[in-house]
Amino acid sequence: MTLTFPAPSKDKAELETGPAFTPRFDEKGLVTAVVTDARDGELLMVAHMNAEALALTIETGIAHYYSRSRNSLWKKGESSGNTQAVQEIRTDCDQDAIWLKVTVAGHDATCHTGRRSCFYRTVGVENGKARVTITDEHRHFDPAQIYAEKKG
Amino acid sequence: MTLTFPAPSKDKAELETGPAFTPRFDEKGLVTAVVTDARDGELLMVAHMNAEALALTIETGIAHYYSRSRNSLWKKGESSGNTQAVQEIRTDCDQDAIWLKVTVAGHDATCHTGRRSCFYRTVGVENGKARVTITDEHRHFDPAQIYAEKKG
């Protein structure tokens, strides 16, 4: 990893309009990453990146994240083959969020459940209770098979 | 606020496929909210919601967030008029992120800089340094005027 990120400016104008990319990592050293499909803009997933994951993503063109559950660097798709080739990287006004437009390899599935997107459910209210409804049941791969194979 | 959210199940299958909406608020009581334009899917902003903001959003159909900088409930667009009418709410596999598809009122601008989207810059590398490039200079409103008016 050779790419490093300078500390964010305290000057709001510099942060919003200056030429330097100075991501505002939170107290855990993470920024939020929003991932959409470069093909049609569909939201695929939301994840987090530390400086190492962000630098690797920029340098290799393949999306890397930081897994908060495993506390480790996470090359997305390493097990399932559904790696993400980054077509464009954007950041927001206060530089604490990253937007990746990606092309998904493998089964064209981003969710570990085998679905194309992690956002396969709508939220609504039913009899005064908040409920979710699955709108995408199509599995691009069988998680039990794919993740078992890679473990072996 | 009448809508409440039960604690998330510890059973992964229940969380991923059960009918209950049980958002996984983090240790600060927040979930990440990704906001896209219902018209064309453009990513407009990333923000955070506490239970109150999420319940108000579901109940009123107008997007509410929790401002981490002001530590308070934030009805988006209250000052600028650029409120967000929610067309659809989605959640992801582990229910720690929310996706709002919205129609923006007012100037059709979501960013406080007056731009349509907060993601008005691409990220790249120039001479070994990470740089940002502004790709959208169009301001839908003049922030100095709009926010000054509302303060007065």
Curated annotation (Swiss-Prot), chains A, B:
Catalytic activity field: 1-(5-phospho-beta-D-ribosyl)-5'-AMP + H2O = 1-(5-phospho-beta-D-ribosyl)-5-[(5-phospho-beta-D-ribosylamino)methylideneamino]imidazole-4-carboxamide
GO molecular function: magnesium ion binding; phosphoribosyl-AMP cyclohydrolase activity; zinc ion binding
Binding positions for Zn(2+) per the UniProt entry: C93, C111, C118
Any one of the GO CC terms: cytoplasm
SUPFAM superfamilies: HisI-like
BP-aspect Gene Ontology terms: L-histidine biosynthetic process
Keyword match Hydrolase: yes
Pathway: Amino-acid biosynthesis; L-histidine biosynthesis; L-histidine from 5-phospho-alpha-D-ribose 1-diphosphate: step 3/9
Gene3D superfamilies listed in its UniProt record: 4.10.80.70, Phosphoribosyl-AMP cyclohydrolase
Compartments where located: Cytoplasm
Keyword Cytoplasm: yes
Broadest EC class assigned to this enzyme: hydrolase
Cofactor: Mg(2+); Zn(2+)
InterPro entries recorded: PRA-CH, PRib_AMP_CycHydrolase_dom, PRib_AMP_CycHydrolase_sf
Keywords from the named record: Amino-acid biosynthesis, Cytoplasm, Histidine biosynthesis, Hydrolase, Magnesium, Metal-binding, Zinc
Quaternary state and interactors: Homodimer.
Similarity annotation: Belongs to the PRA-CH family.
Function: Catalyzes the hydrolysis of the adenine ring of phosphoribosyl-AMP.
Name recorded for this polypeptide: Phosphoribosyl-AMP cyclohydrolase
Source organism (scientific name): Sinorhizobium fredii (strain NBRC 101917 / NGR234)
